[in-house]
């Protein structure tokens, strides 16, 4: 499923960043959802919780911005904008 792959990629990137910096866990992340990503904020949160289970990102608080501009060149993408780490 396209949505699952997008969310899984974000979880991988978040966890990779946490591991590379020696963080104990991820406390939060800011994510931007393109208008054509086929994800609502609620749907993204649900998938993130499932994909992040048993990872350093489990329980991370998500701040999600949803674009409404289908003409945006990144409208089909999900962008990880920032990550909060507990080091």
Please annotate each region the language model reported:
Residues 1-87:
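N-terminal, polar/charged subdomain of small-to-medium soluble alpha/beta proteins
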């Amino acid at each position: 499923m396209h949505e699952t792959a997008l969310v899984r990629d974000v979880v991988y990137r978040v966890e990779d960043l946490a591991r590379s910096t020696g963080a104990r866990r991820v406390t939060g992340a800011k994510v931007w959802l393109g208008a054509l990503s086929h994800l609502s904020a609620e749907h993204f949160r649900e998938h993130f919780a499932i994909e992040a289970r048993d990872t350093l990102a489990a329980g991370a608080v998500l701040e999600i911005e949803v674009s409404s501009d289908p003409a945006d060149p990144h409208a089909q993408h999900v962008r990880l904008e920032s990550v909060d780490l507990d080091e």
